[in-house]
Amino acid sequence: MANYTAADVKRLRELTGAGMMASKNALVEADGDFDKAVELLRIKGAKDVGKRAERATAEGLVAAKDGALIELNSETDFVAKNAEFQSVADQIVAAAAAAKATDIDALKAAKVGDTTVEQVIADLSAKIGEKLELRRVAYFDGNVETYLHKRAADLPPAVGVLVEYTGDGENGTEAAHAVALQIAALKAKYLTREDVPEDVVANERRIAEETARNEGKPEQALPKIVEGRVTGFYKDVVLLDQPSVSDNKKTVKALLDEAGVTVTRFVRFEVGQA
């Protein structure tokens, strides 16, 4: 008897882009463990596994103000376009900035006039008939560059970035803005290599080695191949290692060094993604 369902196969295909039989075989090999099946398909070369696996199904928007960034989810993009929904999001992010909120519980308890953020959301949810969720919040209190990006002209911003940095003058502001655009576009997850958890790097090495073996690479060449692929992984996920979108002959770190700017931390929210 199969230890997976048709729904599991469908979900795996949607997340990885793999074919039906490949998805079924991966679930069989993984003994029904969905996450393991995703990893197996990645080793075997399924397209876009990492990118697709991050997707969720929420609609909504991101909003930013004075060092605060929030994600407010709705069930449909129809509600996300609603002026009252967007106005409430503006009130919530203003409350986040005023309260310097860095977690959802603190933000829900923050004041909006005579009531709380939590009550404002509950009232709007009852009025429009959709479940609304305050998904996440961030707050930085240093020099902060903010960038919001729309997926379509008729939709509210779906991608939001905060970049905290040190560096004065026009060059500092321009460099921080360029970095915010970079993060929005290329989705860096970590600031430096040292920020990447050891278990994540170890898993990348293991996957790189297994993939190279599956490709028939000679055993003596594996260490060099693995190092090359791990370096490529760093270029994908580490901000300072990424080639700059404004000058791909230089890394983000090189351009920041030239501008005399140091990024101390950043955060990126995208509606519907982890």
UniProtKB/Swiss-Prot annotation:
Pfam families: EF_TS. The lineage of its organism: Bacteria, Bacillati, Actinomycetota, Actinomycetes, Mycobacteriales. Residues 76-79 are annotated as: Involved in Mg(2+) ion dislocation from EF-Tu. One of its GO terms (cellular component) is cytoplasm. This is Elongation factor Ts. PROSITE patterns: EF_TS_1, EF_TS_2. It is found in: Cytoplasm. It comes from the Bacteria. Its main location: cytoplasm. Belongs to the EF-Ts family. Associates with the EF-Tu.GDP complex and induces the exchange of GDP to GTP. It remains bound to the aminoacyl-tRNA.EF-Tu.GTP complex up to the GTP hydrolysis stage on the ribosome.
